[in-house]
Amino acid sequence: NPYCLPPTDFMSGNKPITKKIKEIEKIAKSGLIPVTYGDALWFGQNKTYILSGDKIMTHIAKILKPRLCIFALNEDGLYSDLKSKKLIYELQGERPSISENKMDVTGGMTRKVEEASKIAKMGMNVFFVNGNKPERIVKAVKNRTFEGTLFRGKKNV
């Protein structure tokens, strides 16, 4: 069962609230599936900012250090070529081909790649999979061959 968590539940300004992030782990261990999302948040003195779901993933990964992180996309993963949709199965320094969506104020695919790279540098594997094909998420979680892109976790790189 999904359990919706607005970012205001675990963010104060632009900083994560560690104690509240740790509660997300308790929610997950209880059998519920924590679901959060990016949003416009209050920053004080009549200022707001956009917090992307991708940035939230980095905050959660840094505090909870999960075994892996999965970004569910509307695509199969990252492509080396957008026209042929040639999938990059493991990102190893090559530059993926990314089309920019000017309507995406959260940073789009470029932000996803940046945040996934940060998480991988913390030592966790990160998977980009097509969220419209849930069996791919299951395969990634079970460490089976899956269709998508892997950012291999690297410690102290």
Residue ranges and their predicted role:
Residues 1-157:
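C-terminal catalytic "cap/lid" subdomain
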